[in-house]
A protein has these predicted regions:
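Ligand-binding "clamshell"
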Residues: 1, 48, 84-100
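Solvent-exposed, acidic/flexible segments
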Residues: 2, 29-33, 56, 60, ...
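A bilobed periplasmic-binding-protein/Venus flytrap-type ligand-binding module shared by bacterial periplasmic
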Residues: 6-16, 108-124
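Bilobed "Venus flytrap"/periplasmic-binding protein-like clamshell domains
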Residues: 7-87, 105-106
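Glycine-rich beta-alpha junction loops
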Residues: 80-81, 103, 155, 170
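A structural motif
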Residues: 100-108
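Secondary-structure end/capping motifs
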Residues: 121-184
Protein backbone atom coordinates (compact mmCIF):
# COMPACT_ATOMS: atom_id res chain seq x y z
CA UNK A 1 0.00 0.00 0.00
CA UNK A 2 1.22 3.49 -0.78
CA UNK A 3 -0.17 6.77 0.46
CA UNK A 4 1.37 8.68 -2.36
CA UNK A 5 1.84 12.26 -1.23
CA UNK A 6 -0.85 13.61 -3.57
CA UNK A 7 -1.45 17.30 -2.80
CA UNK A 8 -4.61 19.29 -3.42
CA UNK A 9 -3.61 22.73 -4.69
CA UNK A 10 -5.29 26.09 -5.17
CA UNK A 11 -4.24 29.62 -6.02
CA UNK A 12 -2.42 31.24 -3.11
CA UNK A 13 -4.87 32.73 -0.61
CA UNK A 14 -7.77 30.44 -1.51
CA UNK A 15 -9.92 29.59 1.50
CA UNK A 16 -9.97 25.91 2.50
CA UNK A 17 -12.42 24.53 5.06
CA UNK A 18 -11.93 20.88 4.19
CA UNK A 19 -13.74 18.82 1.58
CA UNK A 20 -16.82 21.01 2.05
CA UNK A 21 -14.90 23.65 0.07
CA UNK A 22 -15.52 21.51 -3.03
CA UNK A 23 -19.31 22.00 -2.82
CA UNK A 24 -20.52 24.19 -5.69
CA UNK A 25 -17.02 24.53 -7.15
CA UNK A 26 -15.22 23.32 -10.26
CA UNK A 27 -12.40 21.00 -9.24
CA UNK A 28 -9.78 19.13 -11.24
CA UNK A 29 -10.28 15.77 -9.58
CA UNK A 30 -11.46 12.61 -11.27
CA UNK A 31 -14.72 11.67 -9.51
CA UNK A 32 -13.72 8.02 -9.67
CA UNK A 33 -11.31 8.79 -6.78
CA UNK A 34 -13.45 7.64 -3.89
CA UNK A 35 -11.33 9.54 -1.38
CA UNK A 36 -13.05 12.67 -2.69
CA UNK A 37 -16.52 11.54 -3.77
CA UNK A 38 -16.77 9.37 -0.65
CA UNK A 39 -15.80 12.31 1.54
CA UNK A 40 -18.49 14.44 -0.13
CA UNK A 41 -21.01 11.66 0.56
CA UNK A 42 -19.85 11.62 4.18
CA UNK A 43 -21.00 15.26 4.35
CA UNK A 44 -24.53 13.99 3.68
CA UNK A 45 -24.80 14.41 -0.09
CA UNK A 46 -26.32 11.36 -1.78
CA UNK A 47 -24.91 12.16 -5.19
CA UNK A 48 -21.52 13.88 -5.13
CA UNK A 49 -21.65 14.26 -8.91
CA UNK A 50 -24.50 16.76 -8.53
CA UNK A 51 -22.90 19.08 -5.96
CA UNK A 52 -19.36 19.41 -7.32
CA UNK A 53 -18.32 20.25 -10.88
CA UNK A 54 -15.69 17.52 -11.39
CA UNK A 55 -13.35 18.28 -14.27
CA UNK A 56 -11.18 15.50 -15.67
CA UNK A 57 -7.94 16.45 -17.40
CA UNK A 58 -5.59 14.24 -19.36
CA UNK A 59 -2.65 15.13 -17.10
CA UNK A 60 -1.92 16.62 -13.71
CA UNK A 61 -0.02 19.38 -15.52
CA UNK A 62 -3.24 20.35 -17.31
CA UNK A 63 -5.10 20.29 -13.98
CA UNK A 64 -2.47 22.58 -12.46
CA UNK A 65 -2.77 24.98 -15.40
CA UNK A 66 -6.55 25.00 -14.84
CA UNK A 67 -5.99 26.21 -11.26
CA UNK A 68 -3.52 28.84 -12.39
CA UNK A 69 -5.83 30.23 -15.08
CA UNK A 70 -8.92 30.16 -12.84
CA UNK A 71 -10.78 27.44 -14.72
CA UNK A 72 -11.03 25.38 -11.51
CA UNK A 73 -10.65 26.30 -7.85
CA UNK A 74 -8.83 23.16 -6.66
CA UNK A 75 -6.83 20.40 -8.31
CA UNK A 76 -5.39 17.09 -7.19
CA UNK A 77 -1.75 16.60 -8.14
CA UNK A 78 0.05 13.31 -8.67
CA UNK A 79 2.97 12.15 -6.58
CA UNK A 80 5.31 12.87 -9.49
CA UNK A 81 4.27 16.55 -9.45
CA UNK A 82 5.54 17.34 -5.95
CA UNK A 83 8.83 18.87 -7.08
CA UNK A 84 7.17 21.36 -9.42
CA UNK A 85 4.33 22.03 -6.98
CA UNK A 86 6.81 22.87 -4.22
CA UNK A 87 8.56 25.34 -6.55
CA UNK A 88 5.24 27.06 -7.30
CA UNK A 89 4.39 27.14 -3.59
CA UNK A 90 7.79 28.68 -2.82
CA UNK A 91 7.20 31.35 -5.49
CA UNK A 92 3.79 32.18 -3.99
CA UNK A 93 1.77 31.19 -7.07
CA UNK A 94 -0.19 28.35 -5.49
CA UNK A 95 -0.60 26.67 -2.14
CA UNK A 96 -1.16 23.15 -0.96
CA UNK A 97 -4.47 23.18 0.90
CA UNK A 98 -4.60 19.47 1.72
CA UNK A 99 -3.47 16.01 0.68
CA UNK A 100 -5.53 13.09 -0.56
CA UNK A 101 -4.51 11.15 2.57
CA UNK A 102 -5.94 13.96 4.74
CA UNK A 103 -9.26 13.90 2.88
CA UNK A 104 -9.62 10.17 3.55
CA UNK A 105 -7.15 8.69 6.02
CA UNK A 106 -5.31 5.57 4.85
CA UNK A 107 -6.61 5.98 1.31
CA UNK A 108 -4.08 4.29 -0.88
CA UNK A 109 -3.23 5.48 -4.34
CA UNK A 110 -1.50 2.16 -5.05
CA UNK A 111 -2.01 -1.39 -3.82
CA UNK A 112 -0.54 -4.68 -4.90
CA UNK A 113 -3.14 -7.23 -5.86
CA UNK A 114 -3.17 -10.83 -6.93
CA UNK A 115 -5.85 -13.03 -8.40
CA UNK A 116 -7.34 -15.26 -5.71
CA UNK A 117 -6.84 -18.45 -7.68
CA UNK A 118 -3.14 -17.72 -8.28
CA UNK A 119 -2.60 -16.74 -4.63
CA UNK A 120 -4.34 -19.92 -3.43
CA UNK A 121 -2.45 -22.11 -5.92
CA UNK A 122 0.97 -20.64 -5.03
CA UNK A 123 1.16 -20.22 -1.24
CA UNK A 124 4.93 -20.72 -1.00
CA UNK A 125 5.59 -18.18 -3.75
CA UNK A 126 3.24 -15.68 -2.12
CA UNK A 127 4.98 -16.10 1.25
CA UNK A 128 8.38 -15.64 -0.40
CA UNK A 129 7.18 -12.48 -2.16
CA UNK A 130 5.83 -11.06 1.10
CA UNK A 131 9.08 -11.86 2.94
CA UNK A 132 11.10 -10.17 0.19
CA UNK A 133 8.84 -7.12 0.23
CA UNK A 134 9.03 -6.81 4.03
CA UNK A 135 12.82 -7.06 3.92
CA UNK A 136 12.95 -4.46 1.16
CA UNK A 137 10.72 -2.11 3.13
CA UNK A 138 12.89 -2.56 6.22
CA UNK A 139 15.95 -1.57 4.17
CA UNK A 140 14.07 1.35 2.60
CA UNK A 141 13.00 2.71 6.01
CA UNK A 142 16.59 2.51 7.30
CA UNK A 143 18.16 3.97 4.13
CA UNK A 144 15.72 6.53 2.71
CA UNK A 145 18.35 8.88 1.32
CA UNK A 146 20.06 6.06 -0.55
CA UNK A 147 16.65 4.80 -1.69
CA UNK A 148 15.94 8.26 -3.12
CA UNK A 149 19.15 8.13 -5.16
CA UNK A 150 18.50 4.59 -6.38
CA UNK A 151 14.93 5.42 -7.40
CA UNK A 152 16.00 8.68 -9.08
CA UNK A 153 18.60 6.83 -11.11
CA UNK A 154 16.06 4.14 -12.06
CA UNK A 155 13.50 6.63 -13.37
CA UNK A 156 16.04 9.03 -14.90
CA UNK A 157 15.42 11.97 -12.58
CA UNK A 158 17.45 14.11 -10.19
CA UNK A 159 17.52 13.21 -6.49
CA UNK A 160 15.65 16.44 -5.59
CA UNK A 161 12.73 15.42 -7.80
CA UNK A 162 12.31 12.08 -5.98
CA UNK A 163 13.08 13.53 -2.54
CA UNK A 164 10.17 15.98 -2.98
CA UNK A 165 7.80 13.10 -2.27
CA UNK A 166 9.81 10.20 -0.84
CA UNK A 167 11.23 12.32 1.99
CA UNK A 168 7.81 13.71 2.96
CA UNK A 169 7.28 11.67 6.12
CA UNK A 170 3.86 13.22 6.73
CA UNK A 171 2.24 12.30 3.41
CA UNK A 172 4.24 9.54 1.70
CA UNK A 173 3.93 6.11 3.28
CA UNK A 174 4.85 2.72 1.91
CA UNK A 175 3.61 -0.35 3.73
CA UNK A 176 3.88 -3.79 2.17
CA UNK A 177 2.31 -5.63 5.13
CA UNK A 178 -0.69 -7.38 3.53
CA UNK A 179 -2.65 -7.21 6.78
CA UNK A 180 -2.33 -3.45 7.36
CA UNK A 181 -5.52 -1.75 6.19
CA UNK A 182 -6.25 -4.69 3.93
CA UNK A 183 -9.04 -4.71 1.39
CA UNK A 184 -10.99 -7.96 1.32
Amino acid sequence: MVEGCMPVVAKAGTEWKGIESFIGQSVAVNPSYFAFTGAVMDLGYDNPLDVVDWKVYSSYDDALAAVQNGEVKYALMGTQNNYGVKQLVDSGDIEIVSYQSEIMENYSCCRMVGQTKWVNDNPDTVKAIIRALLRAQSWYEANKEEAVSLHAKRIGQEDDYVAAYMMDDKHYFVNVDPLKNSVC
